[in-house]
Amino acid sequence: MMRDKEQTLGNLIDHQGVSFISSVDSDGFPNTKAMMSPRKREGIKTFYFSTNTSSMRVGQYRANPKACIYFCDKRFFRGVMLKGTVEVLEDAASKAAIWQEGDTTYYPLGVTDPDYCVLMFTAQTGRYYTNFSSEDFTV
């Protein structure tokens, strides 16, 4: 059992360069995509990712906000899955909060690019795997 869930999982999450994010398609099937690490996180409850407004994933989250994110430490073969919902944010404050230098590579019109938005993932439950065992938890 984890002694300090937020510290243990936060440390795992912060050391991964890639995260996996899943949505549900119109046929009810999961769709998983590798993404860069979240731009910002608030504990293990809320995570912010940048993406293109025109992406397939944004359309899926608007139709069905159920989502899952996964972080894996392949060196020690441990990982955490968080289940929750995604909200697509397009307001100026949310976009500015996670904007980074170099983002014009993806969003050439800058922070106000209409094809730039923020995915805010809010976790409800999770499952942590380490040392050949799993632990379910509530966030």
Which residues make up each language-model segment?
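A short mixed-secondary-structure module that forms the rim of ligand-binding clefts
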Residues: 38-76
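N-terminal leader/targeting helix
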Residues: 19-49
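Short Pro/Gly-enriched beta-strand edge/turn motifs at strand-loop
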Residues: 3, 16-21, 100-103
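Short glycine/serine/proline-enriched coil/turn segments at secondary-structure junctions
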Residues: 27-30, 76-78, 129
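Charged, amphipathic alpha-helical segments
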Residues: 1-7, 51-57, 103-104
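Short, surface-exposed beta-edge/turn micro-motifs
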Residues: 16-18, 45-47, 64-67, 114-116, ...
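Charged, gly/pro-rich active-site loop segments
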Residues: 81-139
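A short, Trp-centered hydrophobic/proline-enriched beta-strand micro-motif
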Residues: 11-26, 67-71
